[in-house]
């Protein structure tokens, strides 16, 4: 058992990098909010990944929030290498509002980032992104929180994923 697996299940995201013929998408679980004001996110990516090279080259990336309906695309993004995998995916890349890196039309949300900082930690680089803009499907985020009926994905292990139940438990 790998120790990091003790932190799973974790939300799964798609990280879009590059643009034009270099546009690329990878699946990533290691994504987190780092600051509310200014809004910043962090994503840890191994240097051997194409996404790592493209983020370094363009200093921008987009975090896309997939739903269960995008599971096949998440799987392809996480298991195939390089921009050629886009031909096998059923996603539509669309222009982002503030960055040149495209967003994913089918995603529940797209968070556009410019690289604010990078730091190597062990075998991964933490890319800190300052959020310049975000878009989302209003019905998927009602009342300022996720609408669980939209089946937000979480990664359990290798090919196993779960969604969140529609039942909410409140602490008192």
Swiss-Prot record:
<dbReference type="Pfam" id="PF01613">
    <property type="entry name" value="Flavin_Reduct"/>
</dbReference>
<protein>
    <recommendedName>
        <fullName>Uncharacterized protein PYRAB12460</fullName>
    </recommendedName>
</protein>
<keyword id="KW-0285">Flavoprotein</keyword>
<dbReference type="InterPro" id="IPR012349">
    <property type="entry name" value="Split_barrel_FMN-bd"/>
</dbReference>
<keyword id="KW-0288">FMN</keyword>
<comment type="similarity">
    <text>Belongs to the flavoredoxin family.</text>
</comment>
<dbReference type="InterPro" id="IPR052174">
    <property type="entry name" value="Flavoredoxin"/>
</dbReference>
<dbReference type="InterPro" id="IPR002563">
    <property type="entry name" value="Flavin_Rdtase-like_dom"/>
</dbReference>
<dbReference type="GO" id="GO:0010181">
    <property type="term" value="F:FMN binding"/>
</dbReference>
